[in-house]
């Protein structure tokens, strides 16, 4: 009988899983922001066509790009998202009690909902602006 697998969101609590996301990461040996150090700081690599070095904290969902070889991932994370609870965890995730883990994951879920809500609000505002412009153009043409 095989061991049960973790839900995808929980797999990101495992550093090795986060490291595995850093395919084609531009900074390897001799750099401060290696995949191992990025993953230790909570980041996953989620590149886009225009942002090949885009990394996102799996916990607070803060996205950072424009990395330089000497950037320290932990310091950058603290500077741009000082309230991220991931940064204050002092134990390995495998050492957390179930209660500690669930309390922590509740914070991650809240962060995810806040990020998704913010994205939807921006999307709505952009659509509303386009519709408003279209209505104004219709009114002006009459």
Curated annotation (Swiss-Prot):
BIR repeats: 18-88
Site for Interaction with FBXL7, residues: 126
Residues reported in the UniProt entry to bind Zn(2+): 57, 60, 77, 84
Location of N6-acetyllysine modifications: 23, 90, 110, 112, 115, 129
Compartments, as annotated in UniProt: Cytoplasm; Nucleus; Chromosome; Chromosome, Centromere
Phosphothreonine modified-residue sites: 34, 48, 117
PTM entry text: Ubiquitinated by the Cul9-RING ubiquitin-protein ligase complex, leading to its degradation. Ubiquitination is required for centrosomal targeting. Deubiquitinated by USP35 or USP38; leading to stabilization. Acetylation at Lys-129 results in its homodimerization, while deacetylation promotes the formation of monomers which heterodimerize with XPO1/CRM1 which facilitates its nuclear export. The acetylated form represses STAT3 transactivation. The dynamic equilibrium between its acetylation and deacetylation at Lys-129 determines its interaction with XPO1/CRM1, its subsequent subcellular localization, and its ability to inhibit STAT3 transactivation.
Superkingdom of this protein's organism: Eukaryota
Stored SMART domains: BIR (SM00238)
Predominant cellular place of this UniProt entry's protein: cytoplasm
Alphabetical list of InterPro entries matching this protein: Baculoviral_IAP (IPR051190), BIR_rpt (IPR001370)
GO molecular function: cysteine-type endopeptidase inhibitor activity; cysteine-type endopeptidase inhibitor activity involved in apoptotic process; microtubule binding; protein homodimerization activity; tubulin binding; zinc ion binding
Residues with the Phosphoserine modification: 20
Keyword terms: Acetylation, Apoptosis, Cell cycle, Cell division, Centromere, Chromosome, Chromosome partition, Cytoplasm, Cytoskeleton, Kinetochore, Metal-binding, Microtubule, Mitosis, Nucleus, Phosphoprotein, Protease inhibitor, Repressor, Thiol protease inhibitor, Transcription, Transcription regulation, Ubl conjugation, Zinc
Protein function: Multitasking protein that has dual roles in promoting cell proliferation and preventing apoptosis. Component of a chromosome passage protein complex (CPC) which is essential for chromosome alignment and segregation during mitosis and cytokinesis. Acts as an important regulator of the localization of this complex; directs CPC movement to different locations from the inner centromere during prometaphase to midbody during cytokinesis and participates in the organization of the center spindle by associating with polymerized microtubules.
Domain notes: The BIR repeat is necessary and sufficient for LAMTOR5 binding.
Protein name: Baculoviral IAP repeat-containing protein 5
Native source organism of the sequence: Sus scrofa (Pig)
């Amino acid at each position: 009988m095989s061991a049960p697998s973790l839900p995808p969101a929980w797999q990101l609590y495992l550093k090795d899983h986060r490291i595995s996301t850093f395919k084609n990461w531009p900074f390897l040996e001799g750099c401060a922001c290696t995949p191992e150090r990025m993953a230790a700081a909570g980041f996953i690599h989620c590149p886009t066509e225009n942002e090949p070095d885009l990394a996102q904290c799996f916990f607070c969902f803060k996205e950072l790009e424009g990395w330089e070889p000497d950037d320290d991932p932990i310091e950058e994370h603290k500077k741009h998202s000082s309230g991220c609870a991931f940064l204050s965890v002092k134990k390995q995730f495998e050492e957390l009690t179930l209660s500690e883990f669930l309390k922590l994951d509740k914070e991650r879920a809240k962060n995810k909902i806040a990020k998704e809500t913010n994205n939807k609000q921006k999307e709505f505002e952009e659509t509303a602006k386009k519709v408003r412009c279209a209505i104004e153009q219709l009114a002006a043409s009459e």
